[in-house]
Design a protein with these regions (language model features):
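ATP/NTP phosphate-donor binding region
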Residues: 1-90
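Glycine/threonine-rich beta-strand-loop-alpha-helix active-site module
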Residues: 74-130
């Protein structure tokens, strides 16, 4: 086996009542320009959308809604454009695995000049990410 180092700084939090207490500080420690990535209608039906946007009202939220199950590369490209054009500081994923996976690629794609599909297919290398 080759020597390697793996470091995963993704911060995933679960639990009752944690959102109200922890979300703002967890996000704002990275900056004020936030890309808020989420999926379908359940986030709004559940009231979670209103909670998140209310808690982060003093930050500059840019939204990327509608992340599909097994996200389409066009959604990732749209996210890459937003993180670059809006000079996003932090990507906040609220949803399931597809939303989280999309957000991870989008965060990596901010500093990548090529097509984010390269990052998915392991042809691209980025040394920086959000």
């Amino acid at each position: 086996m080759k020597n390697f180092r793996f470091q995963n700084k993704t911060d995933i939090r679960f639990g009752t009542g944690r959102l109200d207490v922890e979300l703002h500080d967890a996000v704002s420690q990275f900056g004020s320009r936030v890309l808020f990535v989420y999926g379908g209608h359940s986030i709004k039906k559940s009231g979670l959308y209103d909670t998140v946007t209310g808690l982060l009202a003093d930050l500059q939220l840019t939204e990327l809604p509608g992340i599909e199950p097994n996200p389409k590369i066009d959604s990732i490209r749209a996210g890459q454009k937003l993180v670059k054009d809006q000079d996003i500081d932090v990507v906040l994923a609220v949803g399931g695995g597809s939303v989280i996976d999309a957000a991870k690629v989008i965060a990596s794609a901010k500093f990548y000049e090529g097509d984010p599909w390269d990052l998915v297919k392991d042809r691209g290398v980025t040394r920086r990410k959000l």
